[in-house]
A protein has these predicted regions:
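Intrinsically disordered, low-complexity polar regions and short flexible loop motifs
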Residues: 488
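Bacterial N-terminal signal peptides that target proteins for export
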Residues: 1-9
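Formylglycine-dependent sulfatase
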Residues: 21-471, 480, 491-493, 497-510
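Functionally engaged cysteine thiol sites
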Residues: 79, 515-518
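Bacterial N-terminal signal peptides
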Residues: 8-16
Length: 518
């Protein structure tokens, strides 16, 4: 009997060892959640919430279990090139892809391939839904839910329009750029429907009678699709998977159900601290023969209301409502990972393609080189590596996600000799036993509209570099901006022309030169 008991114990021990080894060697799944135009208000860090009453309970909850990068940046603050660099690992410096053109028609990006290709070659199932790349290409995916859809948008019976509540001239910006406000239903309307969604170039009715009797928004559909897919994957637990989930809010038009607007009292809403004539010592507007969109939209918005305060309050109210709406969608996906037993087997990333200026620098858009355009939320949870309440202040950027996933998931891929992949793995920052934070920098670019001569590409564009202390901006005509974030986190004072900052200016300028030559 004693021998029998020893045998049973030994067998159980071997079984436990086998389970441990299998679990240790099992590849981690990956779920990457990417929002559109979500600035650092979605970082999950209270200190970064310059609008104090922003409500993002799901992001905040996830942040407590994640590695939170408090200085994370886009490499270009425009949708298509930002996403292209993220998913290919090729910097705009090397691809020279700076516009919203079709990314795979760029010869360098087409040859480079994507992180989806790398995961598939490593035996992963590759799944997606929503807005991932700016232009959808079916061959990137084994299975896909819904393509990008910026709806719902107001419908007048013939075409998409700006919402009827938006005054002129801002409403002239159209149904996407010039529209915001709660989804509603007009009294005594004779239209069968007053809202449409638009996917693959086709208008589709969006039915809304009340908050309880309505269609799901595109973001809600994508969240529920991901939830159902995770339930299916949790039941199989066979091959590992890479899932990307793309949400469009808070991209314009800023339309979400009214209960999200009700979270914020319009009259008592806290606003960022604005500086009058904030753009006076900057040089972006002087680089173009036309008024850049951000400056133009800002002027249109302000001139449409009785005061600047009223105008910005209306816009920011809609932006915050949209952020809270997408926060719920993020929570649906993360909660599904927990309920389906995938939480401890899955790397989770929450981020955005770039930030957004909410009126800072007299600018209402993205595609600028200042902090609010470039800065993004970046939260990463790696099972058995990330620790709770970990905040990492080292400057990093979206280009670092590709090498991070390759490193942590131990992926193998064919590194083509003529393809330069930039970025550095963040694993040593996530691992608290290492925490290598030394000398990291984030590089960003804005298209100067001068793309006709590839040999002079770098000289013809506008560049920025962000270190732990400084932001330096250099425009193609040689104009410069320098901001000391230790003393001026709002970037209100351009120090580039001050003699006593000449040494700092020369130092950081040389850092940018070195980065652009790599």
């Amino acid at each position: 009997m004693k021998v029998f008991r020893i045998g049973v114990i030994f067998s159980a021990f071997l079984l436990l060892i086998g389970i441990y080894v299998e679990a240790k060697n099992k590849p981690l799944n990956v779920v990457l959640i990417i929002c559109d135009d979500l600035n650092r208000l979605g970082s999950g860090v209270d200190e970064e919430k310059y609008i104090s009453d922003i409500k993002t309970p799901n992001i905040d909850k996830f942040a407590k279990h994640s590695s939170v990068f408090t200085r994370a940046y886009a490499n270009i603050a425009l949708c298509s090139p930002s996403r292209a660099s993220l998913f290919t690992g090729v910097s705009p410096v090397h691809s020279q892809f700076l516009s919203n053109a079709v990314w795979w028609k760029n010869p360098i990006l087409s040859e480079a391939g994507t992180i989806m290709d790398v995961f598939r070659a490593s035996g992963y199932q590759v799944i997606g839904t929503g807005k991932i790349m700016h232009h959808f290409r079916p061959r990137e995916w084994d299975e896909y839910g819904f393509q990008e859809d910026y709806g719902p948008m107001p419908w007048d019976g013939k075409s998409r329009v700006a919402h009827k509540s938006i005054p002129k001239p801002f409403c002239d910006e159209g149904p996407i750029g010039g529209s915001f406000g709660p989804i509603d239903r007009s009294e005594n309307s004779k239209l069968e429907y007053e809202w449409v969604c638009r996917s693959s170039g086709v208008n589709q009715p969006f039915i809304y009678e009340s908050n309880k009797e309505r269609d799901k928004t595109p973001d809600e559909k994508n969240a529920l699709w991901a939830k159902n897919k995770l339930k299916e994957l949790g039941g199989k637990k066979k091959e590992p998977f890479f899932m990307a989930v793309g949400f469009v809010r808070p991209h314009t038009p800023l339309h979400v159900p009214s209960h999200w607007f009700d979270l914020y009292d319009f009259d008592s809403l806290s606003l960022p601290t604005f500086l009058d004539e904030d753009s006076a010592d900057t040089f972006l507007a002087k680089q173009f023969e036309y008024i850049p969109k951000g400056f133009y939209r800002y002027r249109q918005l302000i001139s449409s209301y009785n005061s600047k305060d009223e105008a910005l309050r209306a816009w920011i109210h809609a932006y915050l409502a949209s952020v809270s709406a997408v926060d719920e969608c993020i929570g649906i996906v993360i909660d599904a990972l927990k309920s389906e037993g995938l939480w401890d087997d899955t790397i989770i990333i929450v981020t955005s393609d770039h930030g957004y200026q909410l009126g800072q620098k007299d600018f209402l858009f993205k595609n600028a080189l200042w902090e609010e355009s470039m800065r993004i939320p970046l939260l990463i949870r790696v099972p058995n590596l990330s620790k709770e309440n970990m905040y990492i202040d080292s400057p990093v950027s979206l280009i670092d996600i590709f090498p991070t996933l390759v490193d942590i998931c131990e992926l193998k891929y064919d590194q083509k000799v003529n393809i330069i992949r930039a970025g550095s793995s963040l694993k040593d920052l996530i691992d608290p036993s290492v925490r290598d934070e030394l000398n990291r920098k984030a590089i960003g670019v804005v298209n100067s509209d001068k793309l006709d001569n590839s040999e002079e590409f770098i000289e013809r564009q506008h560049w920025t570099i962000r270190t732990d202390r400084w932001r330096y901006i250099r425009y193609s005509n040689g104009s410069e901006e320098l901001y000391d974030h230790d003393k001026d986190p709002n970037e209100w004072n351009n120090l580039a022309l001050l003699q006593n900052y000449k040494a700092a200016l020369n130092m950081i300028s040389e850092e940018l030169n070195k980065a652009l030559q790599k």
